[in-house]
């Protein structure tokens, strides 16, 4: 796969709409050409202890952050500024370029639910899953198929796991290798 956006969300609590950070990496012709990271004020705006233990984020990080619709539009504008796939209406994600995530079921659900939460029109994104792809590609040769394990098998050193941009970068690397 040569053209895609690798995306990763971290959530504040058990609600899929509670995205508190986003990382995205644009890959064109097999090369990483741009990336984006932002904190997001989650909705609902509360943190579960378990989630904080995973990613280390809390109210002190996101109380002054923008809500999702503003971050999404800024991401599209910044990530795709040099690319001709962005429509004039930056509220619409170009669905011609697929999204890639490790455990895409989680990230696609987060995206769908946060769009629903803010009553944004949800385009039918095409998602590819590096978790599912790694199970086929490595066929039982890995201890597990967690992001850091698969990234290492693909030659990528993921040093800041559960930081949304670091995870999106690892996902992009994996996708370039096995999709």
Annotate the PLM regions.
Residues 79-81, 129, 139, 175-179:
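Short alpha-helix boundary/capping motifs
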Residues 1-117, 124, 144-162:
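Conserved non-catalytic scaffold segment of RNase H-like nuclease domains
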Residues 107, 126, 167-170:
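Catalytic-loop motifs flanking and including active-site residues across diverse enzymes
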Residues 163-176:
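Acidic, divalent-metal-coordinating active-site segment for phosphoryl/phosphodiester hydrolysis
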Residues 128-144:
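Short alpha-helix plus adjacent loop in nuclease-associated cores
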Residues 114-118, 136, 153, 174-178:
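Active-site catalytic microenvironments for nucleophilic, acid-base chemistry
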Residues 11-13, 132, 170:
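Short, glycine/acidic-enriched loop or turn micro-motifs at the edges of active sites
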């Amino acid at each position: 796969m040569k053209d895609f956006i690798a995306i990763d969300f971290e959530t504040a609590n058990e609600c899929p709409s509670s995205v508190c950070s986003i990382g995205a990496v644009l890959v064109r012709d097999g090369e990483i050409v741009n990336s984006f990271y932002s904190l997001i004020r989650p909705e609902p705006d509360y943190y579960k202890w378990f989630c904080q233990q995973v990613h280390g984020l809390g109210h002190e990080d996101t109380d002054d952050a923008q809500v999702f619709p503003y971050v999404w539009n800024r991401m599209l504008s910044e990530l795709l500024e040099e690319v001709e796939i962005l429509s004039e209406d930056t509220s619409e994600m170009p669905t011609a370029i697929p999204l890639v995530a490790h455990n895409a079921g989680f990230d696609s659900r987060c995206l769908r639910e946060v769009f629903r939460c803010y009553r944004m029109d949800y385009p039918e994104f095409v998602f590819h899953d590096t978790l599912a792809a790694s199970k086929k590609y490595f066929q039982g040769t890995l201890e597990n198929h967690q992001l850091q394990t698969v990234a290492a098998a693909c030659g990528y050193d993921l040093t800041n796991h559960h930081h949304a941009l670091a995870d999106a970068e690892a996902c992009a690397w994996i996708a370039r290798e096995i999709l």
